[in-house]
C-alpha cells in the first residue's frame, strides 16, 4: 500500500471522466482488489444520497433563460438587415440562406452556453440541472430544447429548414413551429426504429470480418512503426494522449543523447506527460497495421488491454472486441436520437476578436480582397498574417492563420472584442457537407439584362446557358408582357409608332377593327412568332424565326402612313404593300418583306426580300413531306452564313423540289388545368365540345399529349382500318402511299385514288389500328416575278445589280408544323437574292448600300428604296441631327454604337394633318418595348413598373389626383382615347407638369364623357427613349413614343424647386444607367427604388423599375440578354456546399460507407491545394532511387490512417471515445488483401486472385522474383466472403454458393477462427482453448534466414529510409492530410 504523502484530497464536483481517472489512479496505487472495495463504498454512498434527496420533476423546475428575449430580438434584427441587403442586390440567395442559418445557430448555441451558469446562479439544486449536468439523465441539448430554444430543425433527408423554432418546449410552440417541429419528431421516431437495426447489422458484419483475430504471439519482430508528433500543436493534446496511452514503442526515444524510453516499452500516462513536456522527436509506435503476423496479432503490436491496463494476454479474442466496440456505440446513439430527433447541429466558423481598443495595422501586400461566404467584403490572407493593434499604452500582436478572412481595413479603429477575422474552419465542413444546385427564380416578369461579360462555351453558342466570370448583377427590367390569347406575337418592332387598333393592354384579343370602318379599310400586320419551342432552352432556328403569321382578319391598306419605313434596330425589316391594282392575281393578302441589315450594307449573294406566296398558305396545322429527292431545307442554322448581320445564300443548296405533300391536322394547345370532355384515341365528329369553350372544327381521331404546363390535343381526320397482324406498317412514323396501290383489308380491297398517308396507332391495352389520312399535294413553281416590282434606275450606266429568285420550303421533312388558331401557315417562301457583277480588277466594290428616298408631290408622299454599289470603308458625312431634309449613311465600322440612324424616318409637316383626316377613329396607343428579335414578345410598361421621385415628399400614392399649387396651373389630363395627333393622356398624376417639354402643342380634343361633348385643351407630352448604348433615339416633336404611361405606373423622380440637385450627383445620371435602391441622388437623400434611368429632365428623372439579382462567379445564367422572362422562370443556378445535420443518423451511414469502401460522391474541395503543397516534397522524394517504392508503401499506410480518422471523426462528433486500435484492426482486415495483376508470376498465383499482402511479400522473398499486384480495399462484406475458411463464409451469406464453390475447388478449412469451431461444435482457439496452439517464439528467432543470392535491396533500402526519415516526418506532418483531428501521420521503417 502506498504512503499517505502521495494521496490527494479532492474537494470538487466530479463527473464521469473524473471518476474514470480516479479509478485508474486507485488501480495504480492499490491494485485491483482494494480498488473494488473502495468503489463498492462509493456506490453505497450514492444510493443512500439519492434516496435521501429523492429528486422529483415538475414543470416549474424548467427555468427559462432570462437573456433569451434580447438574443432572439438581436437575431431577428440581423435577419432583417440581411433581407434588406438581399433586396438591394448586395448578397444573393445562397449567401442569405447561409448567413441566416448561422445567425440562428449561433443564437441557439449562446443560449445553450448560458444555461449552465443560469442554473448555477439561480437554483443550483434544480432537479433538471442536477440530472442533466451530472450526466445521470439527459444531456445539454435536450435540456436546451426544454428551456432554451428548439432551434433549427432538419427534415428527414438531413436538410436544414431555414425557419428556426424560437420557442422552447416549456413556453409552447406556435402552429407553424409545431408543424416544423413534427418534421424533426417524425425523423426521431423513424431513426430510432430503422437506424437501430442498421447499427445492429453493422456490428454483425464487423464481427464477421475480424472474428479470427486472436493474440497468439508475444512479438512478431517488426521494425516498422507509425510516427506520431505533437509538434506545431497540430494534434489536440487530448487526442495525442489518447493515441499514445496503452501503445508500445517501436523505437528508442532520445532526448539529446540520453535515451528516455526504449523499444518495446509500453506507454503509460507518466511517459506521455514527459513526451509532452520535452516536446521530443516524432514518437514511433507499433500498431496492428505494422504487425507481421498473417492472420492473427502479437501482444506488442496490440498494446495494453483496456480492461486491466497491462499488456494484452495471449489467447485474447481482440478481433471480436474490436468489432463490438465499433458497432455498439452506434446502437446506443441511434436509440438516443428519439429525444433530440431532428434538431440541427452544425458548426460555425471561429472568430478572432480584438484584445483591446485601438488602431489595427497589417501588411497590405499580403492580402487580397474577396467576398466571404456571407457576401461581406473581406481580405483573404494566403499565409500567416501578423496584425498589430495599437492602443494608448500597449501594442497587441495577433497572428491570423492562412486561408482566413480579415474583416477590417488597414488603419481602422477597432473596439475591444470586435471580430477582426474569421478562421476558415476546416474541421466540420469536410464531413457533413454536400454539393447542392440551387435555382433562383424571377419574382416578376420583365426583360433580362446583365452588367458584365459572360462566357459562351463553344459548344453552347446557340444555347442560353452562360457562365459568369465575375461577380455582377442581373437586372430584370419590369414590364408586363402582353400574352394575347390568340396570337402571341409582337406586331411591331422596337421603337415604333403605333397607330390604329393594336393589341389592347389587357391580355385579351386583338381589338376590334376600327369603328369608322368606311375610311380605314384594312390594317396589315406582319410579325414573327414568339417561338417557345419544345426545347426547354428556347433556342430558335431560323426556320421558326423567318416564319410569318399573316393574320386572317387584318389586311394591308394602301394608306401612306403605313409605308413609313421606320428603321428598327437589330433586324431591320420593312413592309412594302402590294398594290392590288397592279397585281390582279392572288396577291391581295400578301406583302413583300425587305430585310435590311443593321448597318444598311449588303454583301453579294445576300437575301434582299422575302415574299410569301398565298397559294402555299394553309389555315391548319400539319406535317410536310417531300418526295424522296435529296433536298435540303435551305434554312438550317449552319446553311445560312451570317456575315456582319447579313444573311447570305450558299449556292449549293438551290435544288429543285418538284412537289411536296402537306398532311393536315387540327392542333389545340390547352392549359394543363383545363378539363377535357373527350378521351384519348376516341373518334369525334365536327363541332364536338372538346373543353368548356372549345369546339372541334373537323371530325376524326383524337390524340392527347401532355407536356410541361400544357396539353396538346390533335385531331387527325381520315379513315380507320383494322389490319391483319401480318401487315408491316411502320410502328412509329407514317408512310405515304401513291395512287394506284391496292390496300387490302380483311373484308374488302380497293384501289387508292389519291395519295394517302398511313399511320399506325397503338392505344394502350387495345388492338392497334391504321389511320389513313388525306394528303394535299403542292407543285413547286418558280413563284411570281418579283423583279418587276423593283424597276432598275434608268440613268444607271452599267447594269450591275441583279435580283435572283429562289424558292425554298420553310419546314423540314416530316417536321410537325403547329399553327395558332385563326392564323395561316406559310409553307414555301420566295426569296429575292441580291447579286452583282464583281469587277475583277478592283476588289474594293464589295457591298451595296441601301437607303430610302422620300419624294413628296402635292402632299402625297412616296418612299423609294435606293440601292447603290459602294466601295467599302468609305464613310459618308452624316447630316445634322435636327436637319429634316438631309439623308446620310454611316460608315460600316460600328453601326451599333452610333446614335444617328441611317434610315431616319422623315416626317414632313404636311403629313400629320393628313393622317388625322384619314384616321378619325378611336385610337389606342399601346406600348411596345422589345430589343430582342430572337425571342419576340411584347412588353408593356404599366403603373407597377416605373416610379417617380419627389425629393420633398418622398413617394406618394398614385390613387388620388392631388391638385398641385405651382406657379403654372396644371391642365387636368384624363386617361381617355384620343385622335392620333395627340399623345396618350396620363391619369392619376398629381404633379405631372414638369414632365412636359418646352414645345407644348395645344390640341383641341373632343372627349366623350357621359355623352357630353367637352372642348378641352390638353398638353402634348413628349418622351425620350434611350437605346442600349444610352443614346437618345427618336426625338421628333411629332412622334408619339412607345413609352407611354398607359395604365400609368412608372416612378418619377420629381424635382421640387426648393431643393437643388447636388451638382456632383446629378452629373453621374446617364440614360440607361442602372441605379440600385437607396442611392443618394439629392442633398436630402430621398429613398430611391432600383431601376434603369429612362428620362432625364432638368428637374426630374424617370426610372423604369428593375430588380437586381446578385450572381457570383461560376453561377450559370439561364436565358439571353434582353430576353423576356415571366414570373417564376429560372434566372441563375448556383452550386454551393451545404452542411447537413450532424447527428449520428447521418454519421452511421458514413461509417458504413467507409467500411464498405463505397465511393464518396464529391471530392474534397481542398484537394488541389493539398496536392500543390505536396509537390515540393514529392520532387525531393522522387529524386532518390527508391522513390517509387516509398510512394507505394506510403499510399497504403496513408490510406489506412485516413480511414481510421474518418471513422473516428463521426464518433467523436457524438462524444463517443473509441480507441484507435479497435478501428485499426478492422481497417487492417479491409486493406490486407492484394489483387494479382495480369503480368505477374502466373505460375504461383493466377491473375485476378485475391491474396494477403504479407503472403505476397513472403512469396516474393521465397522466389526471389517480383510479383506484380495492386492493393485493393475490400469492404467488410467482401472481406467476410473472402477469408481462408469456407465454413465461416457460408455461415455469413450466400451459403449454397460458397459451399458449392468450396466443394468444386476442394478447399481445406484449417479451423483456425472462432466461428468455424463454433459451427462445428469444437473448442474455440481462444482463452483456455488457446494453450495447445501456442508458438515457441524463441525458436523462431534462432533459425537464421538463408538465401541463395544476397538481397540487393536490403542494406541500401534501410539506409535510404533512415536517411530520409526526417524529411518524411516534416512533409507528411505538415501537408498530407487534413490535419485537424488526425491522430498520427506518416510512417518510418528503421
From Swiss-Prot:
Which HAMAP family does the UniProt entry name for this protein?
Answer: RNApol_bact_RpoC2
By what name is this protein known?
A: DNA-directed RNA polymerase subunit beta''
Q: Tell me where it resides.
A: Plastid, Chloroplast
Organism in which the protein naturally occurs? Populus trichocarpa (Western balsam poplar)
Which lineage ranks, top first, belong to the organism behind this chain?
A: Eukaryota, Viridiplantae, Streptophyta, Embryophyta, Tracheophyta
> Quaternary state and partners of this protein?
In plastids the minimal PEP RNA polymerase catalytic core is composed of four subunits: alpha, beta, beta', and beta''. When a (nuclear-encoded) sigma factor is associated with the core the holoenzyme is formed, which can initiate transcription.
Which of this chain's residues are annotated to bind Zn(2+)? Answer: 220, 291, 298, 301
Q: Which residues form a coiled coil?
A: none
Q: State its cofactor.
A: Zn(2+)
Superkingdom of the source species: Eukaryota
Q: What is its main location?
A: plastid
* Gene3D superfamilies the UniProt entry points to: 1.10.132.30, 1.10.150.390, 1.10.1790.20, RNA polymerase Rpb1, domain 3
Q: What does this protein do?
A: DNA-dependent RNA polymerase catalyzes the transcription of DNA into RNA using the four ribonucleoside triphosphates as substrates.
Keyword annotations of the record: Chloroplast, DNA-directed RNA polymerase, Metal-binding, Nucleotidyltransferase, Plastid, Transcription, Transferase, Zinc
Catalyzed reaction equations: RNA(n) + a ribonucleoside 5'-triphosphate = RNA(n+1) + diphosphate
UniProt record similarity statement = Belongs to the RNA polymerase beta' chain family. RpoC2 subfamily.
Q: Which gene encodes it?
A: rpoC2
Give the E.C. number(s): 2.7.7.6
Instruction: Cite the cofactor comment.
Output: Binds 1 Zn(2+) ion per subunit.
One Gene Ontology cellular component annotation held by this UniProt entry: chloroplast
Class in the EC hierarchy, top level: transferase
Q: Name one GO biological process term.
A: DNA-templated transcription
Checking Pfam families in the record gives: RNA_pol_Rpb1_4 (PF05000), RNA_pol_Rpb1_5 (PF04998)
